[in-house]
């Protein structure tokens, strides 16, 4: 006996609200119904439906989803053995206090001595005409700070170029003052035995201006009769490079505008017109913040402002000088970036604001350098400043990057030069992702730097241009794999904790350190704080798993159990302990969007779905008797959970919020129902019609609007109006979430009979285009929408936590759908590793 074909639905394992046809027929000679999907068929036991039960229930059709990867026994076994002890809590408080003090002490920049620059300052003769140094304390510093091997420089970090340069400067100075014979002899011996090592060292290890100043000093040493190996072929090559470089420098350029040549004037003394060069002097009296260059100019001109600058620096450091000073903008920007990337910035909000206010007060539309009065901007500081200032709401234009682009569209560190390094290109790349609509310069910067950085990954030498970092390769790999819209705060913190080097150094004219940027205190706090937060998250996750089981959802055999993966979402971005309730509500609401997604996708008949929707609208538990058993479990769990949430919401908001929650869900279920009706009718909507509904059915708005009640702030009507479904901010969140979902799931779903996706709807509107062209269009719409989302995030004048809720929810979708359906297939994808690193694996 045959029965009419029934049409129901089966979800392919994605969270998209789409359907495929499943035809049911009797199996010949069997009491089973055969579910025929394409060429295949599976048998499931048939059970007579009771009154009001649905032939579409899971007793007829059981969808197969991959099981949840994170088992109960694993979650239950979490005892938070790494919980922060009382002593560690005290240590956290101490570290926070010490780092706050570091921020408060930021003045012109903390850095280490430069033996090279100190040697140049020590050359200055007494102003009274006597045969003595004007700064005898600097000569004494040189005498007292020779290293055991006979060299001068940073003892813990050896670069042949750096040590040879500093040693040559010191032995010349001591020779000029006819002192330190023993030190000079040891220095010469070091030079003779170690100079050859420069030949084996990468060119990228060469200090700034080395090929200018080193040959000039070598010539001076020869005149002084110092016994050095002048005939070494490598030394001759350096001299030849200097001559070639000087020939390429037009004389008019040297005096026309400030360039990095001002940093190395001590090596250009035979060609500089000292009267002309004075017009390029910085306001603070220096020449590009370089004590060595400024000392050379003073000895040639006697300029009082030069001397004032040197006195200013020595007043700060006592008996030595650094390789450049001040470093105030550089220090503040990198310190802010450090605490943000390590995930500890919430402890230093006031300090961060003060630092950024300072930087912004010295912002220039041509760009900035490492110091506020530095006349030569660089792309490194400028890009870092543009990104951080923009994300903190300061009004800065991306046009500032045009200063550093040449006629070929390439970006370089300094105007008019061809130098660039991995660290500065990495900062430009990070900056380029924080773009607004229409900012073509940001897109150009992104393409240029991505190309450069990918090439750099294949070239070991490329990683040592401006900074020697613990794992710059790891930083580059992370940035390329997880750009801004795919990088969550906890994941970035975890990665940077592993890559951050508390002993990192930079390379200017010499090797130098920045203790307020590279500091063990930052790392220690980041580790303690990460593990503390993780232990809180583990307890919350255990509670949520118990909620899932006590609600009877383990009996639902048509849906996905993804409590852990879903909890990972809020834990990855609103991770702070004070947002515990927000994470709980976010997770519970998200779980219901998955359950109801699966229910409306495949399990319920259209009549049953309308009954469920009506029950929610009326908030009427009595209608549950008319529902199939599986739907009863859904509604009772839904009803009880959101009544409890509404009760807690009333306490946090000071007013009844049940009606608000009901209205949020009413809109959500209407969107689900519309898609069910489209599927039933095999209707493919237009692209715009599809997007209007699908941006709601993706359910991100529902999750955010309900979770927002539990951020610790009272939601005024004004704030609600700025994040409700009519706001562009929320619409963009839903739109980008929907589009990234579709781009990764449409092919599989189409093969299962799906009729509508953004790609298919666009192809319906444009019958002549190919699928590839339609997909490209969808990606373009998504990328443009993400740029608009950036602008909304930066410019939206609502409390920070609400901005984060909306923006980070959009970003987590980009992460989940990087490779495919990261929710349904999380056990096969990197999401599994992200969950483990965020929730289970403490940092060591």
From Swiss-Prot:
Q: Which GO terms describe its biological process?
A: diterpenoid biosynthetic process
Principal subcellular localisation of the protein: plastid
Gene Ontology CC terms, in alphabetical order: chloroplast
Keyword check for Acetylation, yes or no: no
Q: Which domain of life is it from?
A: Eukaryota
Give the catalytic activity. (2E,6E,10E)-geranylgeranyl diphosphate = (+)-copalyl diphosphate; (+)-copalyl diphosphate = abieta-7,13-diene + diphosphate; (+)-copalyl diphosphate = neoabietadiene + diphosphate; (+)-copalyl diphosphate = abieta-8(14),12-diene + diphosphate
- Positions binding substrate in this chain are 245, 465
**Which SUPFAM superfamilies does this entry report, sorted A to Z?**
Terpenoid cyclases/Protein prenyltransferases, Terpenoid synthases
User: Does Cytoplasm appear among the keywords?
Assistant: no
- Which cofactor names does the annotation list? Mg(2+)
Keywords assigned by UniProt, alphabetized:
Chloroplast, Isomerase, Lyase, Magnesium, Metal-binding, Multifunctional enzyme, Plastid, Transit peptide
Under InterPro entries, the record lists: Isoprenoid_synthase_dom_sf (IPR008949), Terpene_cyclase-like_1_C (IPR034741), Terpene_cyclase_plant_C1 (IPR044814), Terpene_synth_N (IPR001906), Terpene_synth_N_sf (IPR036965), Terpene_synthase-like (IPR050148), Terpene_synthase_metal-bd (IPR005630), Terpenoid_cyclase/PrenylTrfase (IPR008930)
Q: Which GO terms describe its molecular function?
A: abietadiene synthase activity; copalyl diphosphate synthase activity; levopimaradiene synthase activity; magnesium ion binding; terpene synthase activity
- Annotated binding of Mg(2+) 2, by residue: 597, 601
DDXXD motif (motif): residue ranges: 597-601
Instruction: State its Enzyme Commission number(s).
Output: 4.2.3.18, 4.2.3.32, 4.2.3.132, 5.5.1.12
Function, as annotated, reads: Involved in defensive oleoresin formation in conifers in response to insect attack or other injury. Involved in diterpene (C20) olefins biosynthesis. Bifunctional enzyme that catalyzes two sequential cyclizations of geranylgeranyl diphosphate (GGPP) to abietadiene. The copalyl diphosphate (CPP) intermediate diffuses freely between the 2 active sites in the enzyme.
Describe, as the record does, how this protein assembles with itself and its partners: Monomer.
Please quote what the entry notes about the protein's domains. The Asp-Xaa-Asp-Asp (DXDD) motif is important for the catalytic activity in the class II active site relevant for the cyclization of GGPP. The Asp-Asp-Xaa-Xaa-Asp/Glu (DDXXD/E) motif is important for the catalytic activity in the class I active site, presumably through binding to Mg(2+).
UniProt name for this protein: Bifunctional abietadiene synthase, chloroplastic
Q: Provide the species name.
A: Abies balsamea (Balsam fir)
